[in-house]
Amino acid sequence: MRPSGRKTDQMRKISFERNFSKHAEGSCLVKFGDTHVLCTASLEDRTPPWLRNTGKGWVTAEYGMLPRATGERIKREASSGKQSGRTQEIQRLIGRSLRAVVDLEALGERQISLDCDVIQADGGTRTASITGAWIALHDCLKWMESRNIIKVDRVLKDHVAAISCGIFAAQPVIDLDYLEDSAAETDANFVMTGTGGIVEIQGTAEGKPFSQEEFLTLLGLAQTGIAELVDLQKQAIAG
């Protein structure tokens, strides 16, 4: 039995609130159960130095947690003067995931920066960030299209979403919350496109190694879950 009472293949309640920020070109408050992340997309008329005069744009991401996003206050990384390795890893993952579905040449020589700020954490912050950031990116591109800067369907090639899966209490489960994640025997994150392409898989055995059969079971759970997330994204942007 999962602590939340969910079935092994049941995700938490997922919701997207678009246009959460009045200033950003695109924004979305994404909720995976009690994990809440504010994702904003900002258009910048510049590119990294290595892309200047190439005709290509760039999509990048930053990730952070508010001090009381967790049970005990965590120190702001800005006050320590450096980002943790975990923060750097997660924001690079978010950026890679979004670039996988963007035509950087069609974007042109400009940059879109995604900021993913965790308001409340209960497991799965990176997967929620990726899934919500896609909506913020989409809405930023729609903002650009409304000003005749780009065509969305030329820049945004597909959906992208992410979900965690793991082995908890000897059972493969999807969308782990904090209680499950902290006690999981195996923990994995899957990032996939709307057409089923695999962008990234991160998997770790916390205790005994997991078998190929167990991995394929987790992959199957992730494929089903991400298909559901993509459907929810489609519903959100159609509203």
Curated annotation (Swiss-Prot):
EC numbers for this chain: 2.7.7.56
Pfam families per UniProt: RNase_PH, RNase_PH_C
Keyword tRNA processing in annotation: yes
Gene Ontology molecular function: 3'-5'-RNA exonuclease activity; tRNA binding; tRNA nucleotidyltransferase activity
InterPro entries: ExoRNase_PH_dom1 (IPR001247), ExoRNase_PH_dom2 (IPR015847), ExoRNase_PH_dom2_sf (IPR036345), PNPase/RNase_PH_dom_sf (IPR027408), Ribosomal_Su5_D2-typ_SF (IPR020568), RNase_PH (IPR050080), RNase_PH_bac-type (IPR002381), RNase_PH_CS (IPR018336)
Residues binding phosphate: R86, G124, T125, R126
UniProtKB keywords: Nucleotidyltransferase, RNA-binding, rRNA processing, Transferase, tRNA processing, tRNA-binding
Catalytic activity, as annotated: tRNA(n+1) + phosphate = tRNA(n) + a ribonucleoside 5'-diphosphate
One GO BP annotation of this record: rRNA processing
Assembly mode: Homohexameric ring arranged as a trimer of dimers.
Family that this chain belongs to: Belongs to the RNase PH family.
Job description of the protein: Phosphorolytic 3'-5' exoribonuclease that plays an important role in tRNA 3'-end maturation. Removes nucleotide residues following the 3'-CCA terminus of tRNAs; can also add nucleotides to the ends of RNA molecules by using nucleoside diphosphates as substrates, but this may not be physiologically important. Probably plays a role in initiation of 16S rRNA degradation (leading to ribosome degradation) during starvation.
Protein name: Ribonuclease PH
Taxonomic lineage of the native organism: Bacteria, Pseudomonadati, Pseudomonadota, Alphaproteobacteria, Hyphomicrobiales
Gene name for this UniProt entry: rph
